[in-house]
C-alpha cells in the first residue's frame, strides 16, 4: 500500500465494523484523532446458511444494521462488501476438511488472515485509504532500532486477542491500526454509552462459531 504524497489531506482509515461495540468505538477513536473514516462490514454468510448449517458469525443482518446506524451517527461513509463465496471456500470448507481429518481448526485465525487483513487491505488501497482499523484488543508498535512492526498483547489481559493476529505479515502490520489495544473493556463500553451508540450494551461477538458438522 502506497502512502499518500499529499501531506495536506487527512489520512484515510477503513474501519472493519462488525456491528459490535468494539469496532464502533475503534471508529469513533480514529475519527476523534483526525482520520477520514469509512466503515465497512463484511457479509460472510447468507441468513439461510446461519439457520441451517449451525454457523454463527458476526456481521449478521442485525449486526449490519447496527454498524450502519453507528456509521450514520458518526456521519461517515459505510459499505457492505459481499465475501460469501470466499468465506465458504477459504474458511468453512477448510474447517470441515481439518475437522474431519481429526484436527482442531481455528476459523477466526483464518478469517483474520484471508478475509479481514487480505481483502480489506486491498480494498482500502484501491480506495485511497491508508489504514485498516479493527476492534481487536492488541497493539502494533514499530521497533525504533530495527524498523520492524511488533504485535503485542492488549493491556486488558482478560480481552487480549493478539493470538488471533499472530500470522499477519510486516506489510499488513504496517497498515493496521488497533486503537483499543491500550484500553480496558469497561472503558470501551463507557465511551459507547457516552456516544449513545445503539450497541453500547451489546454482548461481545465471537467472529465465528461453527457447530459440529453433521455426519450422514
Segments predicted by a language model, with ranges:
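Conserved A3 ("GATE") glycine/threonine-rich loop of ANL adenylate-forming enzymes
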Residues: 159-160, 202-207
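Catalytic core of tubulin tyrosine ligase-like
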Residues: 189, 198-203
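Active-site and glycan-interaction determinants of carbohydrate-active enzymes
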Residues: 195
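Conserved small/polar residues in nucleotide/adenosyl-binding loops
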Residues: 208-214
Amino acid at each position: 500500500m502506497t502512502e499518500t504524497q499529499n501531506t495536506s489531506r487527512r489520512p484515510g482509515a477503513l474501519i472493519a465494523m462488525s456491528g459490535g461495540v468494539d469496532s464502533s468505538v475503534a471508529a469513533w477513536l480514529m475519527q476523534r484523532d483526525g482520520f477520514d473514516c469509512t466503515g465497512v462490514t463484511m457479509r460472510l454468510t447468507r441468513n439461510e446458511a446461519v439457520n441451517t448449517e449451525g454457523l454463527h458469525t458476526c456481521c449478521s443482518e442485525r449486526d449490519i444494521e447496527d454498524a450502519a446506524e453507528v456509521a450514520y451517527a458518526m456521519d461517515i461513509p459505510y459499505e457492505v462488501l459481499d465475501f460469501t463465496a470466499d468465506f465458504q471456500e477459504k474458511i468453512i470448507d477448510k474447517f470441515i476438511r481439518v475437522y474431519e481429518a481429526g484436527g482442531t481448526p481455528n476459523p477466526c485465525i483464518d478469517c483474520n488472515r484471508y478475509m479481514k487483513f487480505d481483502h480489506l487491505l486491498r480494498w482500502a488501497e484501491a480506495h485511497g485509504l491508508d489504514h485498516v482499523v479493527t476492534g481487536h484488543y492488541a497493539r502494533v508498535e514499530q521497533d525504533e532500532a530495527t524498523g520492524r512492526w511488533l504485535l503485542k498483547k492488549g493491556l486488558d489481559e482478560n480481552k487480549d486477542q493478539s493470538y488471533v493476529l499472530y500470522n499477519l505479515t510486516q506489510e499488513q502490520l504496517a497498515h493496521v491500526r488497533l486503537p483499543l489495544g491500550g484500553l480496558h473493556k469497561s472503558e470501551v463500553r463507557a465511551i459507547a454509552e457516552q456516544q449513545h451508540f445503539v450497541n453500547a450494551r451489546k454482548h461481545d461477538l465471537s467472529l465465528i462459531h461453527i457447530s459440529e458438522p453433521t455426519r450422514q
